[in-house]
């Protein structure tokens, strides 16, 4: 009997010991579900904010990338000259097709609308309200030309801003028989003076030029920017024109 009792006690002690080890420790505390949820939400917010910042940076970089596909080209006039822009911005024609002054960036700025920029000078070809061509440091509405293919597959460039008031006839970019730049209102689209043949050299990507007001000048150090007319920049075959002179 005693042996049975002893073995029973031993069995009870062993069971008690096993139950003690199986019981979870008081020091082990379950973490609160709300606390876990808070940590999870915090991590998600951190991840989303990082993704958003990365997306904004990527979008800014994408905006800075060149978006417009244009061409570097020479413009051959049917009069027998290549259009050229001199270092001072004067425009005329030359028969020499090897000079860099005949290279132009043809940048699309609208549907069948282009900006014509000298590669060496960085100046835009512009046409003012009197039909004169002049070089512009800034891209303005006067620098926009409509590009149209004529019947003979030559291309004509007309001002997007100016035309004859009565007839509505467009004003065109043109060279005369001597290779001098003509007034836009004197150029007829049916004449060789207005007919150009682009001779592309390469395709290039361009950033969209910022549009400025007509007459706005490039600010210089210590000089207040003005919005006066661009009379000083007006050219006629490379010579300054007096605006007060009637045509």
Swiss-Prot record:
It is linked to Spinocerebellar ataxia 27A: A form of spinocerebellar ataxia, a clinically and genetically heterogeneous group of cerebellar disorders. Patients show progressive incoordination of gait and often poor coordination of hands, speech and eye movements, due to degeneration of the cerebellum with variable involvement of the brainstem and spinal cord. SCA27A is an autosomal dominant, slowly progressive form characterized by gait disturbances, ataxia with tremor, dysarthria, orofacial dyskinesia, gaze-evoked nystagmus, and learning disabilities. This is Fibroblast growth factor 14. InterPro entries: Fibroblast_GF_fam (IPR002209), IL1/FGF (IPR008996). Keywords: Disease variant, Growth factor, Neurodegeneration, Nucleus, Spinocerebellar ataxia. One of its GO terms (cellular component) is nucleus. Nervous system. CDD domains: beta-trefoil_FGF14 (cd23330). SUPFAM superfamilies: Cytokine (SSF50353). One of its GO terms (molecular function) is sodium channel regulator activity. Its main location: nucleus. Pfam families: FGF. Residues 15-25 have a biased composition (Basic and acidic residues). The keyword Nucleus applies. Interacts with SCN8A. It comes from Homo sapiens. Belongs to the heparin-binding growth factors family. Residues 1-38, 214-247 are annotated as: Disordered. Probably involved in nervous system development and function. It is found in: Nucleus. GO terms for biological process: cell-cell signaling; JNK cascade; nervous system development; neurogenesis; signal transduction.
């Amino acid at each position: 009997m005693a042996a049975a009792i002893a073995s029973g006690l031993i069995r009870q002690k062993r069971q008690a010991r096993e139950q003690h080890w199986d019981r979870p420790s008081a020091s082990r505390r379950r973490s609160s579900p709300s606390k876990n949820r808070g940590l999870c939400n915090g991590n998600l917010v951190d991840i989303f904010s990082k993704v958003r910042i990365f997306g904004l940076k990527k979008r800014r970089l994408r905006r800075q990338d060149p978006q417009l596909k244009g061409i570097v080209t020479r413009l051959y006039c049917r009069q027998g000259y290549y259009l050229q822009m001199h270092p001072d911005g004067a425009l005329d024609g030359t028969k020499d097709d090897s000079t860099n002054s005949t290279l132009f960036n043809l940048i699309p700025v609208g549907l069948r609308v282009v900006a014509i920029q000298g590669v060496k000078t960085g100046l835009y070809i512009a046409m003012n309200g009197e039909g004169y061509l002049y070089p512009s440091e800034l891209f303005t509405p006067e620098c926009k030309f409509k590009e149209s293919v004529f019947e003979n597959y030559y291309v004509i460039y007309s001002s997007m801003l100016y035309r004859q008031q009565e007839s509505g006839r467009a004003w065109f970019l043109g060279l005369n028989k001597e290779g001098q730049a003509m007034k836009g209102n004197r150029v007829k689209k049916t004449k060789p003076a207005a007919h150009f043949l682009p001779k592309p050299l390469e395709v290039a990507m361009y950033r969209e030029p910022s549009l400025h007001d007509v007459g706005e000048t490039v600010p210089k150090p210590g000089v207040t920017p003005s919005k006066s007319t661009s009379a000083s920049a007006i050219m006629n075959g490379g010579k300054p024109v007096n605006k007060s002179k009637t045509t």
